[in-house]
């Protein structure tokens, strides 16, 4: 069987829940049997003693797992601004990035810096909005902030309703024309928009 390889990085402002998301991905893909936490010193990817002592990610780490017919390399990066150089080194090898945003804080200054770096390196990016259970605002107002401060083509995949398909369609003129004629958008077309950095 010919397997494809995908390199994906998890990037975020400090305390957004980035390593927790990485642990969850590894757990649900069968790579680990128990999810750890940075602050407990038992995160799978935070193996350095200094990371365990301080409760933060300092060094980029990788884990590999199989997802369907793809070999995936997951890179967990530091979120603290003091270790930005370590994070930026990983951008050169990424096929895709997951930018984690803390729902209770919204788009922070460092989030904007990360976004600009992802755009500079032309990395297709998924946004993962974390900690919405702690948010003091509605998902709609947070989405509005993200579209205003990051990109108007950031779309919530929470509901696949008519509004979702309209927001996806306006990301590309050709797709919009097709959508207005047929009222349909195929999954492959959405994948292509993401890969070509027209949809986030």
Can you say where each PLM-predicted feature lies in the sequence?
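P-loop NTPase catalytic nucleotide-binding module
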Residues: 1-16, 35, 103-200
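P-loop NTPase switch module centered on the Walker A-proximal segment
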Residues: 1-101, 107, 141, 150, ...
């Amino acid at each position: 069987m010919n397997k494809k390889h995908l390199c994906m990085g998890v990037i975020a402002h400090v305390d957004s829940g980035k390593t927790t998301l990485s642990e969850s991905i590894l757990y649900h893909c069968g790579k680990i049997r128990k999810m750890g936490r940075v602050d407990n010193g038992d995160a799978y990817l935070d193996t350095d003693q200094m990371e365990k002592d301080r409760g933060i990610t300092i060094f980029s780490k990788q884990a590999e797992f199989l997802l369907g017919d793809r070999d995936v390399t997951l890179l967990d990066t530091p979120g603290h601004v003091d270790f930005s150089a370590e994070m930026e080194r990983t951008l050169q090898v990424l096929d895709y990035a997951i930018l984690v945003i803390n729902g209770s804080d919204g788009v922070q200054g460092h989030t904007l810096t990360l976004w600009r770096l992802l755009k500079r390196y032309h990395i297709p990016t998924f946004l993962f909005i974390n900690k919405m259970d702690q948010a003091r605002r509605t998902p709609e107002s947070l989405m509005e902030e993200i579209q205003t401060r990051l990109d108007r083509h950031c779309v919530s995949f929470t509901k696949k309703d008519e509004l979702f398909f309209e927001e996806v369609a306006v990301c590309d003129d050709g797709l919009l024309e097709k959508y207005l004629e047929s009222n349909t958008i195929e999954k492959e077309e959405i994948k292509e928009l993401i890969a070509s950095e027209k949809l986030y």
